[in-house]
Amino acid sequence: MQTRKEKIISLFLVLIFLASCGTQELLPGASETPKAAPTAGAPLPTFTPTPQGFSTPILYGPNPDAFPANVNPLTGLQVKDPDLLRTPAMMLSISHFPVAARPQAGLSFAPWIFEFSITEGATRFLGVFYGEFPEPEIPIAGDCAVRRDPFAQTSTLLGNRIWWDENANGIQEDYEKGIGGICVNLYDAAGQLLQETTSDSNGYYGFNVEPGMYTVEYKIPAWLKFTEKNIGNEDKDSDADPLARRAEADVQSTLLYLDAGLVLSEETNPSVNGVAPPPAEVGPIRSGRLLYIDIHNFFPNSCFVFASASPQILPTLPQCYLVPHDEASGGAMIAIQKLKDLAEENRESRSGNFTYASNVFSETPPAGGWVANRIDVYVAYRNQSAFVYDPLSGSYWRYVDDTTQENAGVLHAEIDRLNGRQLQFENIIVLEVEQEVFEYQGQPIPALLDAYLELGGGGFATLFRDGMKYDIRWSLEAREYEQETGQARPIYFTDADGNPVPLKPGQTWLFVSTPYSFVTNQMDGSWNVRFIPPEGSK
């Protein structure tokens, strides 16, 4: 059987090194500096709880018939337009180097993002865009400072999300956005102000409390008002009284469903007058890599967009559209309208069915595991990143460096250029994948790596979700569904016995590592991922 190298020739990216990683500065901890004053002396309403039910916990997959028609099989979440699930994925090769590429535009819209080595200490992203197109946004925000740090839990949690009720139905849909910069005040049962905080860029707020009765007050601008309260299930409704602007809670254990939905009032929002949204484009886009061949094979009918590639491999890559190469700005951008047009053209030109339903999604985490509140990823001295767990959103906030020698290991929270929102991911997966230097006509090319994510393959992996770490397996072996239909499906995850390991509903970041890299427990709730490149690579 021919190896991939032979096929391409025939056609024409340790613990002992951690001492050199630099001092990492991360800031998990609430920085609560609201600017709106609490309502002094205002009488608190009488607490009269209304019993409500809760949504059935999500459990979907792995086969297509186990996903509702309006649920994205790559996230386990509802989509706004289910018809887009009939459009194959758009796969964008997105630059991470040079630093001019950052912050990238569109990453918060991608259900999956692969990060992989392109040698010389640099990494690149492959964004999987499916079920929703990116859109530029000037986020709706309150009058207070947006909270920019993950929440640090020290006691029982009370809080959760302030969101934009786009369809004004009083129900929090999966695709509706959060509202940052809302000041939130916490009162005890006697009406005494205890704490103040603000919502983060994705709308989450919270307090560390002891068991007891509390009132939460939301300080919203005059151009916003509350949606109707107590519609539907407790975990998806708005709890704020539209007139009192408050919600009550009897806290006996962690309570993360005290939400507030907002809609426009009759007044005009002064903060957006004359402010233009970011350009409607995604990227920056850079060159294609050999890894795309394998990923294309398990994302059938997908459309790959990149900026050319090395001449030795370009003829073999899955080409859907090539963008002009622009190295000075970190890569060329692609207009969102062009992306939509390409997706429609690709949809119309493809024949045969496809499905990306391959994994199980569950709100209930697997049993066991180790505490994982932070993941530090070391690729090179000037390529360090981290994921910090936020218990309010149940996701990991992404942090990156600035690639400079003097600031090596100093990290900052990363946003999406399209909307200014914090990047956060519910699942972080480290894949152990065999990689080697590519050879062309018998000569190694140290700047090109070949990573083997081939159909029929498998290997070890690490899953981080819900602030926990799990040892799992990745697999591309054909299951009964593939054997009966002949259709390939995306990479999936199991335990050591081959049982499905559920992903958490939401976005997934996949780091393509090597079998000789390290995932090390720092014994303080944090983990280090140390990438070791293949022998002979740059």
Residue ranges of model-derived segments:
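C-terminal motif of bacterial Sec signal peptides marking the signal peptidase cleavage site
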Residues: A19-S20
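A surface/extracellular/periplasmic glyco- and lipid-processing/surface-interacting theme
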Residues: G53-F114, T119-T154, S265-K538
